[in-house]
Amino acid sequence: MFVQEEKIFAGKGLRLHICSLDGAEWLEEVTEEITVEKLKEKCLKHCSHGSLEDPKSLTHHKLVHASSERVLSDTKTLAEENLQDNDVLLLVKKRAPPPTPKMAEVSADEKRKQDQKAPDKDAILKATAGLPARSTDRTVAQHNMRDFQTELRKILVSLIEVAQKLLALNPDAIELFKKANAMLDEDDEDRVDEVALRQLTEMGFPESRAVKALRLNHMSVTQAMEWLIEHADDPAADAPLPCENSSEAAGGLATGEAETKPTLGAGAEDPKDELTEIFKKIRRKREFRPDPRAVIALMEMGFDEKEVIDALRVNNNQQDAACEWLLGDRKPSPEDLDKGIDTTSPLFQAILDNPVVQLGLTNPKTLLAFEDMLENPLNSTQWMNDPETGPVMLQISRIFQTLNRT
């Protein structure tokens, strides 16, 4: 019987199961004193029938301990690698490292990237320095980018006036708007995203604080969570929002008026004046609410509070855009926001001629939606998805896009 040389020397004998990637399996009997490199050499000789074809083949392979999935170090002994009898080892060929690119190839690749790179502003100015200046109306080009939002606001202002006149002709207009006013109170109290509120309460935040945080942060769960963490130890965080107090006061006033009005008699007040007062109340409840975080951030830059609120109102509560407005020419001005579209323009006439819009203007809910979108553009999505107001907004958008392309 053939006896391997390693068994002649002292040392604990190990029986190791070797597996190669081609599916071959065999048993190697070695002592724990030999190195992993020697074992690897024996394994390669077994695979190549007793001779190594490539001298570098030893460095191109590695032994992996199957159960622990670790690569064995060539310089350590089997004892140092803590191999046990009947362990399974995998003989694996190492991945060849990617070839190092030649300098000529690197230079050519860099040159190709430079050729494909778009020129920056400095390069454009340098290349066009010798060209004659041409009169380009850059103001119009910039205006077209925000044309839809600007025109939509003007359209809403004019449509609100038309809707008020149409609804005032309805004999039940006062009752309709009293109900709308009550709906508005309920809407203000209940407008909390239930899913977002549940997420915050499941995190352990008190419900009252979570509601306040969501209202302050436009129903953004992430921003509301940040606010709750920042104000965790702030006792003022439990105080109600100013808008909640004003809503309660307005609601009480409306209730009081409703109770006293019947006693004054039917002819005590002109219905038109009463409608005007209701319209004013609705508009007060839909007043623009600046983002408190944006107000604080912009005031810390040194801007006056009134200027900051005007900037946020003009730029739909977008802090970055408001900052640019404050630093720029401040156009459009807050006064421009209350100007309607030219009522003789083809665009406005096309909108008024649309049957869906005509029908929608007789619905008090449409007027409420227009008022809300006018002062809080972030709520536009809510009204676009509403079954009553959504079709009206869709028709306005389609008419605008159609006429804008012609």
UniProtKB/Swiss-Prot annotation:
Domain UBA positions: 186-231, 289-329
Domain annotation Ubiquitin-like: ranges: 14-98
Subcellular location: Cytoplasm
Compositionally skewed regions (Low complexity) per UniProt: 238-257
Alphabetized UniProt keyword annotations: Cytoplasm, Repeat, Ubl conjugation pathway
Basic and acidic residues: compositionally biased ranges: 108-122
A GO cellular-component term linked to this record: cytoplasm
InterPro entries on file: STI1_HS-bd (IPR006636), UBA (IPR015940), UBA-like_sf (IPR009060), UBA1_UBAC1 (IPR041926), UBA2_UBAC1 (IPR041927), UBAC1 (IPR052476), Ubiquitin-like_dom (IPR000626), Ubiquitin-like_domsf (IPR029071)
Gene Ontology molecular-function annotations: polyubiquitin modification-dependent protein binding; proteasome binding
Positions of the STI1 domain: 354-393
Coiled-coil zones: none
Region ranges (Disordered): 95-122, 238-272
Pfam hit, one: UBA_7
Gene Ontology biological-process entries: protein maturation; protein ubiquitination
Functional pathway: Protein modification; protein ubiquitination
Domain notes per entry: The UBA domains recognize and bind polyubiquitinated proteins.
Quaternary context: Component of the KPC complex.
Purpose of the protein: Non-catalytic component of the KPC complex, a E3 ubiquitin-protein ligase complex that mediates polyubiquitination of target proteins, such as CDKN1B and NFKB1. Within the KPC complex, UBAC1 acts as an adapter that promotes the transfer of target proteins that have been polyubiquitinated by RNF123/KPC1 to the 26S proteasome.
Designated name of the protein: Ubiquitin-associated domain-containing protein 1
Gene it is expressed from: ubac1
